[in-house]
Amino acid sequence: MKIIENFFDSKGLSSDSEEFIKLYNPSTGEEYAHVPKTTRNEFEKIIGKMKSAQSLWANTPITKRSDILFKFKVLIEKNFDLIAKIISEEHGKVFSDAKGSLQRGLEVVDFACGIPHLLKGNHSINVGTNVDLFDIKQPLGICAGITPFNFPAMVPMWMFPLSIACGNAFMLKPSEKVPQCSLKLAELMSEAGLPDNVLTVVNGDKNIVDLILQCEDISSVSFVGSTPVAKYIYTECSKTNKRVQALGGAKNHMLIMEDANLEDAVNGLIGAAFGSAGERCMATSVAMPVGNIQKPFMDLLKEKASKIKVGESLDPQSEMGPLITKEHKQKVLSYIEKGCLLYTSDAAD
């Protein structure tokens, strides 16, 4: 059985953990790999390496940092389909959705390449009697990112390129359900010339999350996931005075007025609700057609929803892939059971 590695010293390295999480292919249900629960000893060793790496990286000229990020951008473009395939295989997202999410992440890398301009400070003269004001932007130190299962490339790429561009070292903890994409991105960063241990990847579940939150050597944490976990992260990080950016789960509602274009409204809802199998933070979970448009809207929605081609993620004919796990599927089915009226059930099968 394939064992997923951690990433430090610019390469994938096996964990010494004896505890593992099983990984299953969402399309086939086949068990294909085991993810280690990184131990405290491993974590502390990696943090020690990152502290040394960060102090050197912070003194690297910003033009050099920008150059490495640009090379990383080029490597992503060269390996675009390969990375998208990894996303599809481990998450279940259809290939077109995988490529779209990767492109969104790549746009952030492109933005981070402009770091020489983004890090400029400010100077104000005579803000008070004989007082001038200067402000400068300096690295925080070691930053960490805890990312969700639904966007294995895009969300990590929101986080580490900008953090690293600013002179920080970055520890990435991907979802234990989708670890392989993060490892590939770290490998490409190393290939682009990033020094050892400026970017590391550690695997696990709540065990490694708690180590990150409690570590006094980590200065900031970015998180995307559920609202309860976001609240937990804010609470725990406050104990060690970390800066925190935690994006909790969101719910979108769609209101369809009587004068709306019926075709556009239904197409918009189909994309918003069923894109990426609905596994998006901003997926539309509630739609309210108003007045006389309700029946024609629901009839057209039923017609179009029943035609969505559900299949394996890499099947070119598939328009919607599977949910991430069988447990998640059961959760969604439980919502259907609580509903007042089921219009179509083809996709649920």
Positions of PLM-derived features:
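Hydrophobic face of alpha-helices
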Residues: I47, S66-L69, K73, A84, ...
